[in-house]
From Swiss-Prot:
Coarse class of the protein's main subcellular location: secreted
Signal as UniProt keyword: yes
Residue ranges annotated as propeptide in the record: 20-47
Post-translational modification: Contains 2 disulfide bonds.
Domain statement: The cysteine framework is XIV (C-C-C-C).
Protein's organism: Californiconus californicus (California cone)
GO CC, one annotated term: extracellular region
Ubl conjugation among keywords: no
Record-given protein name: Conotoxin Cl14.1b
Length: 66
């Protein structure tokens, strides 16, 4: 029972942790976008590297292009 509860808590908090890590890296400008796309590993990678132009929003950004 306790293991199951801990597993569920871990699953629920992982996207939040990832969002806060990215917020710390890029100064928080994309925090809202990252929270919305928390499950999209590709978007996270592009946000971390800073390849996206500022006018790209969310999932439209691929390899630095809209």
């Amino acid at each position: 029972m306790n293991v199951t509860v801990m597993f569920l808590v871990l699953l629920l908090t992982m996207p939040l942790t990832d969002g806060f890590n990215i917020r710390a890296i890029n100064g928080g400008e994309l925090f809202g976008l990252v929270q919305r796309d928390a499950g999209n590993a590709l978007d996270h990678g592009f946000y971390r590297r800073g390849d996206c132009p500022p006018w790209c929003v969310g999932a439209r950004c691929r390899a630095g292009k809209c």
